[in-house]
């Protein structure tokens, strides 16, 4: 492990991809109320359980013709309330036409049945890229919200959840679902990724100093150290 003394450091958020601005990534589908095994439920995230909160999900879609790096972006629910935002794993790249699904088991974001909620995706600077909402006491068992054939956001009462695929097609199956990682805050333990900038003393020798250094921290652990001139 590297022993480092960090002086005059500032925290800089990981930059968002320039391609991700302008509402290029969309929230394509969400599931609020997952059915249980007694009523024909499905284990949507493949963790061995049905009908629990871990199967709530938000599905993102890249409708553009270019790959978009959403690493360091955030998923959140209603602004100034609800659950804490989670930070999407660095280097999460969504290819053109690709879907990625984030389950509550990773995000820890609760979709509120009673009061309804707003689900949002934000870039690395906390600028809102897209958002959707649903009313309170409205979600039905295994009935998702998503974009219908007319391109309207609606409760898809004539369909079933399709995490990882198009809303008007049969579900691709859990083995084919690209599941994303999103790190929520956990008490005093930092989860997520950020870069420290400043003068770094590496402690490898008394004169081992990087005047304009960078340190990548992932989940509270130092992953890389380099000079800005590298």
What positions do the PLM features span?
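Intrinsically disordered, low-complexity linkers and terminal tails enriched in Ser/Thr/Pro/Gly
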Residues: 5-6, 16-187
């Amino acid at each position: 492990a590297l022993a480092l003394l960090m002086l005059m450091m500032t925290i800089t958020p990981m930059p968002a991809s320039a391609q991700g601005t302008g509402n290029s990534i969309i929230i394509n589908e969400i599931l609020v109320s997952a059915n249980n095994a007694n009523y024909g439920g499905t284990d949507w995230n493949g963790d061995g359980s049905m009908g629990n909160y871990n199967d709530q999900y938000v599905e993102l879609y890249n409708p553009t013709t270019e790959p978009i790096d959403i690493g360091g972006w955030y998923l959140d629910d209603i602004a100034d309330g609800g659950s804490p935002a989670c930070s999407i794993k660095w280097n999460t790249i969504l290819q053109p036409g690709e879907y990625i699904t984030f389950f509550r088991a990773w995000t820890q974001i609760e979709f509120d049945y009673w009061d309804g909620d707003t689900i949002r995706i934000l870039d690395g600077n906390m600028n809102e890229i897209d958002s959707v909402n649903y009313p309170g006491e409205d979600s039905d068992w295994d009935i998702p919200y998503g974009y219908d054939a007319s391109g309207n956001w609606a409760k898809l009462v004539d369909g079933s959840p399709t995490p990882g695929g198009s809303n008007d097609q049969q579900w691709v199956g859990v083995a084919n679902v690209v599941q994303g990682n999103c790190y929520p805050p956990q008490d005093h333990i930092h989860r997520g990724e950020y870069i420290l900038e400043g003068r770094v003393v590496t402690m490898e020798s008394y004169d081992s100093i990087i005047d304009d250094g960078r340190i990548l921290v992932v989940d509270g652990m130092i992953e890389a150290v380099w000079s800005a001139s590298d």
